[in-house]
Amino acid sequence: MKKLLTVMTMAVLTAGTLLLPAQSVTPAAHAVQISNSERELPFKAKHAYSTISQLSEAIGPRIAGTAAEKKSALLIASSMRKLKLDVKVQRFNIPDRLEGTLSSAGRDILLQAASGSAPTEEQGLTAPLYNAGLGYQKDFTADAKGKIALISRGDLTYYEKAKNAEAAGAKAVIIYNNKESLVPMTPNLSGNKVGIPVVGIKKEDGEALTQQKEATLKLKAFTNQTSQNIIGIKKPKNIKHPDIVYVTAHYDSVPFSPGANDNGSGTSVMLEMARVLKSVPSDKEIRFIAFGAEELGLLGSSHYVDHLSEKELKRSEVNFNLDMVGTSWEKASELYVNTLDGQSNYVWESSRTAAEKIGFDSLSLTQGGSSDHVPFHEAGIDSANFIWGDPETEEVEPWYHTPEDSIEHISKERLQQAGDLVTAAVYEAVKKEKKPKTIKKQMKAKASDIFEDIK
């Protein structure tokens, strides 16, 4: 769960008035002003919204290692090439895993498979349900044989519950949560293996199953799969070894979810930022990266950072990561700059400066991980994740990791605000400073400043 711990809240000084962070979102009044000449960075939310539609509606759930994830990667790479970026594809292996479906009485139920459990036969398993309470040995009778054991979380470890069910002759195990949650629980077998399928589901779904007679479970093993990172590079002119600024977002989703906000929104805002920033003069290299397999444990970003050379690491300056920046949930009224340690860094400072320039007053510094900024931080690179959240409950949205994470719950106003702010923040980090090229010019410039002061 992407939760937020508020550490610092920003106050903006405008015309001598102290403005506290707003608890509601208002549309941006103008495009971002990025220089004294008031040249504009025209971030367009409608472009990002269109890309979200392609990812979440035309393609749909983008589970790591699947054809849908690869189709998304092709779309992203094509978009980057149209922007004349130098595009590279970095492939990597992902761990073997189980995925599947569960249904009962004509209703599909979201599940998470336990690592270390067995798959079902290809056709799946349809069997009567056996209510095994908390899964103690005494909870199983001879009647459990050949059935699917339905067990509540609590008291015993998941492995103990599963082994007791297997010993009693159960064909599979469904463990349901004992507390409310937005997503199904994942039973942790602590590195052990069992010979029957084991899955976890939400509390409400488990309680509903106690009233049903049978269920159908299909669990398939996925092995030898790969995912890919898509990297689009904008290089500065006439600079051999520039510092590197990273703008990143993951494009995969969890099973069943169209992933409109998580994270079609971050990917789409990143691509629109690339369009806006491609022609901006800069003395730094910008790498726009769409990471694969984030939902499996930050696999894409970890692989990328692990394979940076020593020279690249020394040149790496900062990482701006975008994850869930388009929600329409009214309560998610604060845009958080989420650092792993909760401390101010280059991302926060450039974001705060950008917010002051564009008049954005709903920005807070927070502590937290669970996204692709983490590997950069661990490598010593200043990094942060941008995400909308509710300052009261720390929740991001009620549709997180569910089939309801669809384009109907995307706000163009939130996309515009996040896009304006992060684009301006990245510009603060990469803009080309005008500096005298020679000592003579530098002395002349200083003399001119003095003359201006005494006129």
Curated annotation (Swiss-Prot):
Monomer. Optimum pH is 8-9. Its EC number is 3.4.11.6, 3.4.11.10. Binds 2 Zn(2+) ions per subunit. The keyword Nucleotide-binding does not apply. GO terms for cellular component: extracellular region. Residues 1-31 form the signal peptide. Catalyzes the hydrolysis of a range of N-terminal amino acids. Belongs to the peptidase M28 family. M28B subfamily. The lineage of its organism: Bacteria, Bacillati, Bacillota, Bacilli, Bacillales. Zn(2+) 2 binds at D262, E295, H401. Zn(2+) 1 binds at H250, D262, D323. It is an enzyme of class 3 (hydrolase). It catalyses: Release of N-terminal Arg and Lys from oligopeptides when P1' is not Pro. Also acts on arylamides of Arg and Lys; Release of an N-terminal amino acid, preferentially leucine, but not glutamic or aspartic acids. PANTHER family: METALLOPEPTIDASE M28 FAMILY MEMBER, PEPTIDASE M28 DOMAIN-CONTAINING PROTEIN. This is Aminopeptidase YwaD. Its cofactor is Zn(2+). Keywords: Aminopeptidase, Hydrolase, Metal-binding, Metalloprotease, Protease, Secreted, Signal, Zinc. One of its GO terms (biological process) is proteolysis. GO terms for molecular function: aminopeptidase activity; metal ion binding; metalloexopeptidase activity. Its main location: secreted. It holds the Pfam family Peptidase_M28. Stable for 20 minutes at temperatures of up to 80 degrees Celsius. It is found in: Secreted.
